Amino acid sequence: EVKLLESGGPLVQLGGSLKLSCAASGFDFSRYWMSWVRQAPGKGLEWIGEIDPNSSTINYTPSLKDKFIISRNDAKNTLYLQMSKVRSEDTALYYCARSPYYAMNYWGQGTSVTVSS
């Protein structure tokens, strides 16, 4: 059974940094593209970015590429999202997803991040 479990919230200070993790199990993590997606309160899903199995290609939504860093550790079956210089609009539910062939077919339950002033 494929499982994705996000962690790393819930509170971060305005202008601060936070690192989210996504622990994967039930599949060969090292073979798959992985993505991060978020959903702010009352808004739709926003794709953050994706990383390939070799960590050689990392794609980001242009508006977020300067403040978010996606990485992975295949030995630990874990995906990461490093957030920096957070603002109030970064308050959201953050999801990791398995994304073979650019179609996200397995999702975690999400981890909540609240930016506090």
UniProtKB/Swiss-Prot annotation:
Q: Which UniProt keywords apply?
A: Adaptive immunity, Disulfide bond, Immunity, Immunoglobulin
GO CC annotation terms, alphabetical: extracellular region; immunoglobulin complex
Question: Does the keyword field hold rRNA-binding?
Answer: no
* Any one GO MF annotation of this record: antigen binding
**SMART domains listed in its UniProt record:** IG, IGv
Give the matching InterPro entries: Ig-like_dom (IPR007110), Ig-like_dom_sf (IPR036179), Ig-like_fold (IPR013783), Ig_sub (IPR003599), Ig_V-set (IPR013106), IgHV (IPR050199)
One Pfam family hit = V-set
Q: Which cysteines are joined by disulfide bonds?
A: 22-96
Q: Which GO terms describe its biological process?
A: immunoglobulin mediated immune response
- Where is the Ig-like domain positioned along the sequence? 1-116
Q: What other note does the entry give for this protein?
A: This gamma-2a chain was isolated from a myeloma protein.
Q: What is this protein called?
A: Ig heavy chain V region MOPC 173
